[in-house]
From Swiss-Prot:
Organism: Corynebacterium diphtheriae (strain ATCC 700971 / NCTC 13129 / Biotype gravis)
Name used for this protein in its record: Glutamate--tRNA ligase
Matches recorded under PANTHER family: GLUTAMATE--TRNA LIGASE (PTHR43311), GLUTAMATE--TRNA LIGASE, MITOCHONDRIAL-RELATED (PTHR43311:SF2)
Keyword list, A-Z: Aminoacyl-tRNA synthetase, ATP-binding, Cytoplasm, Ligase, Nucleotide-binding, Protein biosynthesis
Key word Cytoplasm present: yes
Lineage of producing organism: Bacteria, Bacillati, Actinomycetota, Actinomycetes, Mycobacteriales
Amino acid sequence: MNIMSDVRVRFCPSPTGTPHVGMVRTALFNWAHARHTGGKLIFRIEDTDAARDSEESYQAIIDSLKWLGMDWDEGVIVGGPHEPYRQSQRMDIYKDVLEKLKEAGFVYPAYSTAQEVEERHKAAGRDPKLGYDNYDRTLTDEQIAAFEAEGRQPVWRLRMPERDWKWNDLVRGEIEFKSSTQPDYVVARSNGAPLYTLVNPVDDALMGITHVLRGEDLLPSTPRQLALYEALKVIGVAQQTPEFGHLPFVMGEGNKKLSKRDPQSNLFNHRDAGIIPEGMLNYLALLGWSLAGEKDIFSVDELVENFDVTNVLANPARFDQKKLEAINADHIRLLEPKDFEQRLRAYLTEYTDFPTDYPAEKFAIAAELVQTRIKMLGDAYGLLSFLAIADEDLTLDEKSAKKNLKETAIPALDAGIAALEGVEEWTTPAIEAALHKALIEDLDLKPRVAFGALRVGISGQAVSPPLFESMELLGKESTLTRLRATREVTPYQVAAE
């Protein structure tokens, strides 16, 4: 279609397992194409495999789209003019289409077993693994009757036109498959149950899908779908053949596709670690597409404004965890402080044991201290947890203590404690001034030596939010209690030693 607003794309996952980042990337590109063109996104569910499909997986797909902020115009939950949008509820539609294909001669019954096909290949000197040989398309009535008398139940195969197949792929340009590579294929089982090879194009046809954007693994099946569309148009089911675009593989480590067994493939692992939706969407978009000018950080609005499926790269895209985290860090920094504070509080409440009763005014300050220091929301827990525990529950990280609480740290701790005891107005500027005078000016210590021991003393870690601000948040009593306890174990020694 030429009118951009007539664009209709679909996202049609199978509800098996947990949402894979490759699947979600496919959803994103379809969503971005629909939003960029002013078209519509149709969301339906391919749940015809009763043995593997589950309601839990279906809900997980819904949750993944909602978390990322991707909406749809027609489909499950929201409804639309082509209901139902779950294939398991459309079986009567598929059976009706199958009967029309039978009546028009586009499909035929095939009785050959896999063993018989292999034996015919061997007898002809061909590779026995070549696949179906189209033998049954010319069966006589007598042969069919004989098979029926044996009790055989046929599968139904689409009669593939004997010609080469060419089309202009939106991502890969001109594609050609030779006729010899496209045998007649099964569209319905021997029990009459329609297969994916039939139901998916039928749904696309009846729902007026104009662009099929899907994974590269489905590229070899395109000639079959083109042939089926020709038949569907003849019997009045399809009005047009959609354009196809095959999106690049998402690769994992090395040269392998990102497997479902790889933890990085699970979208929810990233959410649970503290990747925010803006960071995830930005990174997923980069798995095959990029904004002009090599700009890696962009908003959802910028993605929608600039997305062009013809600019998607055909080469495989490698999933890079470090790059995802770096992009996420940038998006965390772009959040308004109040927005970040609310998201961080919600995250820590859901995924950690950070106290829900920690004072709101203190949490707002703490959040501001870590917003520019974390890559994922989950990083904040390790930086902030020391603020919310009892002084006696603080434990020193062994590596940090061994490095920062040596004999040379004793003067810094003694002088620091003495200086802080004299601070009357417990504010960040007053704390900083007192410690700077006592440690840097009076003792002539380098800041790393002067403040390293104090940092470990109040937080248990060598890395924490800014020292003076952290002391203000802890309060004078807790700060001094922790530093005195640290002084008692300095120089620090591992118990086993």
